Regions:
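N-terminal transmembrane-helix/juxtamembrane module of multi-pass inner/ER membrane proteins
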Residues: 1-76, 120-121, 125, 129-131, ...
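Interfacial helix-loop-helix junctions of multi-pass membrane proteins
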Residues: 122, 140-144, 177-206
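Hydrophobic, membrane-inserted alpha-helices
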Residues: 74-80, 150-157, 174-182
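Membrane-embedded alpha-helical segments of multi-pass membrane proteins
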Residues: 68-76, 146-154, 195-199
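Membrane-interface loops
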Residues: 42-58, 84-168, 173, 215-227, ...
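Hydrophobic transmembrane alpha-helices
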Residues: 156-160, 201-212
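Final/C-terminal transmembrane alpha-helix of multipass membrane proteins
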Residues: 177-178, 230-249
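Membrane-interfacial, low-structure loops and terminal tails that flank and connect transmembrane helices
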Residues: 1-19, 214-233
Length: 250
């Protein structure tokens, strides 16, 4: 039943050699991202914050049940591993994520955002949401742009025109839209964060599309292209990491 459903959407269940390789790459990238994200957040949380809550945000209700689609974002970024048919496109996706992160981290330092959280009840959804609030940065950090939203739409862009059929692409689009709305309904982000996250996704994707061919040689296989790309990006990423950890010490 599961295989039949996945075939109807165009999702590949088998893990060939390239897919296994890129699963390892993705897990490594996620680990590095998590370390940097936490480091940036713990530094930014000590900075003066700005409350950019708008009148529109005040009209948006808290709907705790949206915590469930919100949490989909933590597995959604792995979807391209199942649906891409051109691994150069996956390299492009990784490059988009790198561009989005480095530029977002800079803004997190310059313009840290915080806003008050609503009171919660004792339902299962509210308890889960309370846990999310508890583990988040206080009073606030890493909000504008919403990388939750950015990653979601980079995933959508990565999956377009790949193994998914029209039904599959439509489902991915609606899941991306649902995750985006959930960021507002669980009060993890304000409208400005979400709008910026959308802009970050599409801008990072466009920049990556233009940069990728300059970072890789002509007619190389995807693995070689990934190595060439990371070799050229490594000095920039290393310098950024040194700056971040140096700032945390002073």
């Amino acid at each position: 039943m599961e295989r039949q459903f996945c075939n109807q959407l165009g999702i590949a269940l088998t893990a060939d050699g390239e897919r296994k390789f890129y699963i390892k790459v993705t897990l490594l990238v996620f680990l590095v991202w998590l370390i940097l994200f936490e480091a940036v957040g713990w530094y930014a949380v000590e900075l003066p914050t700005y409350d950019i809550t708008s009148s529109v945000d005040k009209q948006i209700p808290l709907i705790p049940q949206f915590i469930w689609p919100y949490l989909l974002c933590y597995i959604f970024p792995f979807l391209p591993l199942l649906v891409v048919k051109d691994w150069h496109r996956f390299n492009l996706t990784l490059l988009s994520v790198i561009i989005a992160n480095l530029s977002a981290f800079i803004l997190y330092f310059i313009f840290p955002v915080a806003f008050p959280r609503p009171e919660l009840g004792q339902s299962l959804s509210e308890r889960l949401l309370a846990f999310l609030y508890k583990v988040d940065f206080h009073p606030g950090a890493n909000k504008l742009p919403s990388l939750h939203v950015t990653f979601t739409w980079i995933v959508y862009l990565a999956c377009r025109g790949q193994r998914l059929n029209k039904l599959g692409e439509t489902i991915v689009f609606f899941v991306a839209a649902l995750i985006t709305l959930s960021a507002l309904f669980v009060k993890q982000h304000v409208v400005a964060d979400v709008v910026a996250g959308l802009g970050w996704a599409f801008t990072s994707w466009a920049l990556a599309g233009n940069l990728y061919r300059f970072l890789t040689g002509p007619n190389v296989d995807p693995r070689t292209g990934l190595r060439q790309m990371m070799k050229k990006l490594a000095p920039i990423m290393l310098l950024f990491g040194v700056v971040v950890f140096s700032m945390m010490r002073f």
